[in-house]
């Protein structure tokens, strides 16, 4: 018997590229799937294209049109969260299988999800991961749903009624789901809903557990969740695993069909990337000859860090493809950068930031500076001449 694993995703037509990125990531690592796409306005032509692509993976896709009028009047806790988030209430109304994996479309799957489908519900309504901020509740971005129990207990209607009563008092549908399923959900490892995206907030709120496992470069979560407003497809560079999202987004379907050992595994394999990396840590817009250096060194990527927002003279550098700006950076971002640093540019005026010169010397990486910008009190940096033309 050909049994496929049920996956439920919800989106509108404006979010279709994010939806497809999530599907690509799932199919990169998994086969034999049945996708239920909850929506109200995605064109049928997209489904025709997806059917053709997915059939080669022994997968299928269903267009599930939801009557949005049933949920449009419910409030959402933030402007980036739309009423489509309530579509997950209808899972048991349409899914034929006894269990289904629900995923938000700001997630990518980075491994095999078979173990999730093998977990015992133990009479619970869902299997989920505790929220990154409040451990006594679950994050609703990933839910393994006990569809059979939802149907038996008329969960869809119960959720709609409870939402009508409580939607302005709790955190959207996640708040309602936690009310209804209090003490009726089973915990699973954050490996299956590894939450990023609120990194700056986590740092300033002094919650080091938010970065749990991020320091271990060998840790590879199976599902990554880009929570909050700092999505990887936005211009902000605050989000961990940003390149991973763009890797799955950039994959073509022919590549996904390849055998495992033949597939690319990183963003650098499918995109043009710079050969070398340098960094500047600053608290001022005064960066000596920065634009000249950026233009003369096209194979070098310039990573500029500050504890505040950037002024216009630095912000304008964002037009260069080999420049990345990190306002209000976190320790995780700086450590990640230093791990791939080739050399450091000590070209900011004013004071040294975060004892960066000593940190770079400890890494045995070269430091280049101008005579009027050097912060190296031990005179180990290489001093550049202002009229120097070879770099």
Indicate residue ranges for each PLM-predicted region:
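Active-site-proximal specificity loops/subdomain of glycosyltransferases
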Residues: 45-48, 52-93
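Conserved catalytic-core segment of nucleotide-activated headgroup transferases in glycan assembly
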Residues: 37, 271-316
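A glycosyltransferase accessory/donor-loop signature
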Residues: 1-14, 18-21, 147-275
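Short hydrophobic beta-strand element within catalytic cores of glycosyltransferases
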Residues: 366-370
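Short aromatic/hydrophobic "clamp" motif used to bind/position activated sugar donors
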Residues: 100
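Conserved donor-nucleotide/metal-binding helix-loop-beta segment in metal-dependent transferases, i.e.
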Residues: 107-136
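Conserved active-site histidine-acidic residue motif and adjacent donor-binding/catalytic loop
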Residues: 307-310, 323-337, 353
């Amino acid at each position: 018997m050909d049994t496929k694993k049920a996956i439920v995703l919800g989106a509108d037509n404006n979010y279709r590229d994010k939806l497809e990125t999530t599907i690509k990531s799932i199919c990169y690592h998994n086969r034999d799937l049945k996708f239920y796409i909850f929506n109200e306005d995605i064109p049928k032509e997209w489904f025709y294209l997806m059917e053709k692509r997915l059939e080669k993976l022994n997968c299928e896709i269903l267009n599930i049109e939801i009557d949005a009028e049933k949920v449009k009047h419910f409030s959402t806790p933030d402007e980036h969260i739309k009423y489509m988030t309530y579509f997950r209430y209808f899972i048991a109304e349409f899914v034929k299988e006894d269990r289904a994996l629900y995923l938000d479309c700001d997630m990518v799957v980075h491994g095999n999800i078979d173990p999730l489908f093998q977990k015992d519900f133990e009479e619970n309504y869902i299997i989920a991961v505790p929220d990154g901020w409040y451990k006594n509740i679950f994050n609703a971005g990933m839910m393994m749903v006990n569809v059979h129990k939802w149907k038996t207990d008329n969960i869809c209607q119960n959720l709609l009624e409870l939402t009508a009563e409580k939607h302005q008092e709790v955190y959207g549908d996640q708040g309602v789901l936690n009310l209804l399923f209090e003490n009726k959900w089973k915990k699973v490892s954050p490996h299956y809903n590894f939450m990023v995206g609120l990194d700056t907030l986590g740092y300033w709120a002094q919650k080091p557990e938010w970065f749990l496992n991020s320091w271990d470069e060998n840790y590879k979560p199976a599902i990554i969740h880009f929570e909050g407003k700092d999505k990887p497809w936005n211009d902000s560079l605050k989000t961990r695993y940003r390149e991973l999202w763009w890797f799955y987004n950039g994959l073509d379907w022919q590549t996904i069909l390849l055998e495992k050992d033949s597939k690319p595994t990183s963003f650098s394999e499918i995109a043009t990337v710079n050969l070398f990396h340098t960094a500047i840590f600053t608290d001022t817009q005064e960066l000596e000859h920065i634009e000249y250096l950026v233009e003369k060194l096209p194979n070098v990527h310039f990573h500029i860090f500050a504890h505040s927002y950037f002024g216009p003279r630095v912000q304008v550098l964002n037009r260069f493809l080999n420049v990345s700006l990190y306002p209000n950076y976190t320790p995780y971002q700086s450590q990640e950068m230093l791990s791939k640093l080739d050399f450091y540019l000590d070209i900011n005026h004013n004071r040294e930031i975060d004892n960066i010169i000593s940190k770079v010397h400890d890494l045995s990486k070269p430091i280049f500076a101008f005579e009027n910008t050097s912060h190296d009190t031990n005179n180990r940096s290489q001093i550049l001449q202002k009229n120097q033309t070879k770099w």
